[in-house]
Amino acid sequence: MLIIKNGHIVDPMNKTDGVFDIAAEGAVIREIGKDLPCTAKDNVIDAAGCYVVPGLIDHHAHVQPLAKIGLPTEASCFASGVTTVVDAGSTGCANYIYHQGILERLRVNVQAYLNVCTTGLDSLPGCLEDVNPAHWDRAGIKECFDRFGKKAGGRLVGLKLRTSAPIVKELGYKVLEETVKLGEELGVSVMVHCTNPPGPLADLLKILRKGDTITHMYMNIGPDLIDEKGEVIKEAWEARERGVYFEAADARAHFGIPVAQAAIAQGFLPDFIATDTTKLSMNLRPTAFSMAMQIAKYTALGIPFEKVIECATMNPARQLGLLDSAGSLTAGHPADIAVFRPVDMETVHGDRPYGAENQHTIVGHRVYQPVLTVKNGEMVYRDVTF
């Protein structure tokens, strides 16, 4: 039995916030409580001074083998406390099927959005994907969801569209309208990338339904979340009211510190905090870097640590339909656990890579060092100092 003792457990789903022990037996959580008994046969780890949280869910990344530019899935996820990752549309209906066997062998739980482009993002970084609805393989998309969608017990959770002006071109928001219409026909949600949109962000938000996700919510390329008065646009509040999810997934350029500061000051916080990392952006300072660094950045921006953990555990688990298997530390559920050591140090967080134009930075004073990751009761990452 694995017993993690004396850690400060933060579990928003169960409203746990305090120092407790947690025991995992086999692949599941057995018990959480004070001063749990242990024997010489148990693997006992002292987590005093550390936070113990549910295994993180990175709701937006691009991972191998689904993406040519994908990050190394297990190595990058486990080293940052991530036990569930969502690939955000790296593949389309022509190539998703060929990766099923590999996904089944990964210990990380990989969920995925299916790109409306038949070949997904395979053309990147050389050229942009073709999202013209006239070129969609609608029958192929339907077949993918029939075979591999959540209703069939698979990993596909919805449709993905990047609606940047250079991608949709003269079609503008018609592509998003058609994507949402297709999502309605298939009974799935839509994730839309909004950086550099082809028109006012307000018009984009009006198209989205309850359960859809707008990602890169704090981007600052093209029309953004903040109006000329410095206020969050009313259409964003209206979209949230009707159940649209807002995701902060920042990558190297899908984030603007002034936009985030203004929105957070007005109480417009993310539903999900993710990375949108690839092998081109993982571990790159001063941008998204990893989920651990995203936690540090958003706490530096003024969001309480407990709320940030909610945005990286319970909230995405609910949206993905995984509350019975991820996003909480619940007895009888899979033992997916992450342990972070708070380290007080100055860290620069930026919204563009070093040397880029129009870069803004802030200085944070605390980072959260991943020291232990447990997946299904197995220690899959442990820092040498822990």
How would you name each of these model-derived features?
Residues T163-L284:
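Active-site core of metal-dependent hydrolases
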Residues Q100-R107, E143-G153, L204-R209, W237-E238, ...:
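Acidic (Asp/Glu)-rich catalytic clusters
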Residues M1-V53:
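Histidine-rich, glycine-flanked metal-binding segment
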Residues P334-F386:
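C-terminal cap of metal-dependent C-N hydrolases
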Residues S80-V86, S90-T91, R105-N132, K160:
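Metal-cofactor-binding active-site regions of metalloenzymes
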Residues G7, A27, G49, H60, ...:
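Divalent metal-coordination and catalytic microenvironments
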Residues V259-V343:
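His/Asp/Glu-enriched, well-ordered alpha-helical/loop segment
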Residues D46-R105:
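Metal-associated gating/positioning segment near the N- to mid-region
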